[in-house]
Amino acid sequence: ANLAYGVTTTRDPQTGTTDVLTYSDMVDTGKILGPRVYSTGPGVGYWGYNFKSLEEAKDALKQYSKYYNTKTIKMYRAGNRQQRQWILMAAKEQNIMPTTEGALDLRLNITETIDGYPGQEHNHPIYPVYDDIIGLTAFTKKAYTPTLLVTYGGPWAENYYYATENVNKDEKLNYFTPKMEV
């Protein structure tokens, strides 16, 4: 349905599986029709890693840079500050741009910004965001994507569409999308 709505490029900042990488390869080789796909693949998270050294972080990120052929990763609260710094160093060495997950933790967001993570997905878990946080983000040139579909501390935009639109009767969506997905 993406192409039917004029979407020619997609970016998935984190997937639970590697399926999207296969889909991307199939689009790139012309086996299926679809938008260009950029994805991190599965997140680098606390559930899968407990790095004991920079070398362990480098080895783990090789699956992303060499096998998944991704240019970005999404780091999910992967350990203490030292471990997060190792991920950042390993990513830079392998030319992977890491982004972070907001995690409903402003202190975590701030240390990741200070340490040099170039991106954050999801909003800060506070409102309003004051000039000190805005200034730090601007000074470090960190990309800040509030990800309004999944808002921390506020209403999810996804629910807004289900409440205000009748997706089950959208002809184009139903033509290009399996019923179970709608």
Where on the chain are the PLM-derived regions?
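Short, acidic/polar
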Residues: 1, 49-64, 102-111
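Divalent metal-dependent hydrolysis catalytic cores, especially in the metallo-beta-lactamase
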Residues: 1-18, 34-45, 67-78, 88, ...
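Active-site-adjacent beta->alpha loops and helix N-cap segments on the catalytic face
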Residues: 15-26, 77-90, 128-139
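Short helix-capping segments at alpha-helix termini
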Residues: 27-35, 93-96
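Short, hinge-like loop/turn segments at secondary-structure boundaries
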Residues: 28-30, 117-122, 138, 161-165
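Active-site neighborhoods of metal-dependent hydrolases
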Residues: 60-79, 126-182
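Functional cores that coordinate and move charged inorganic groups
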Residues: 87, 93, 99, 103-116
